[in-house]
């Protein structure tokens, strides 16, 4: 869930590790929950100009290669969003085949989840979550990275968000090996191609 109150706005990008932040925010005071994983632009429709200038806006991003593995295992083995799969075991039971399917014309990118396009909702560059409709980045005070959450999260929530009781546990964890073990040459390059903006902007490497 993306979360908002009168002091801060958290943009929860799917499978970026933001579940632990959502849990902490929900447990620490007056938070307005707006739907599912909403983009920053959509969240700002709930904010007036006066409140906007005072909001501390933050989000979490994740290495795209790692994020896609997490997404695959979470959606497949929890039977969540079955529409993300083909119904063909040869494709769905093999990560590399699934990656190829997702980025092929066989996958219907126009499906809707809630009120948003399913491809935009789950499979776009994470930067798109914090851009406006013109493709420009919207003000964000802090972009945390999943890879550093273990070391940064407690201090960030206490010092910046002023939370006192911190929950430090994974929310919706997936069980799998290191992401690099799941890729072949082609799938690795597909993710590099489709997530080139994230990879370049956040300096991610395979």
Model-derived segments and their meaning:
Residues 1-206:
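Membrane-interface amphipathic segments in extracytoplasmic regions
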């Amino acid at each position: 869930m993306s979360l908002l109150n009168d002091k801060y706005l958290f943009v929860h990008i799917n499978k970026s590790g933001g579940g632990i932040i959502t849990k902490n925010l929900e447990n620490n005071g007056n938070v307005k929950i707006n739907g599912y994983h909403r983009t920053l632009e959509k969240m700002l429709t709930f904010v007036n100009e006066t409140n906007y200038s005072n909001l501390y806006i933050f989000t979490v991003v994740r290495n795209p290669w790692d994020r896609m593995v997490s997404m695959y295992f979470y959606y497949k083995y929890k039977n969540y969003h079955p529409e993300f799969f083909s119904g063909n075991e040869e494709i769905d039971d093999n990560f590399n085949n699934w990656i190829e399917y997702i980025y092929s014309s066989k996958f219907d990118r126009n499906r809707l989840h809630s009120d948003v396009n399913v491809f935009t909702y789950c499979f776009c560059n994470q930067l798109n979550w914090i851009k406006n409709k013109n493709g420009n980045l919207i003000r964000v005070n802090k972009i945390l990275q999943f890879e550093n959450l273990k070391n940064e999260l407690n201090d960030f929530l206490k010092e910046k968000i002023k939370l006192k009781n911190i929950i430090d546990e994974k929310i919706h964890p997936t069980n799998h090996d290191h992401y690099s073990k799941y890729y072949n040459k082609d799938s690795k390059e597909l993710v590099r191609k489709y997530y080139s903006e994230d990879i370049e902007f956040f300096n991610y490497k395979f």
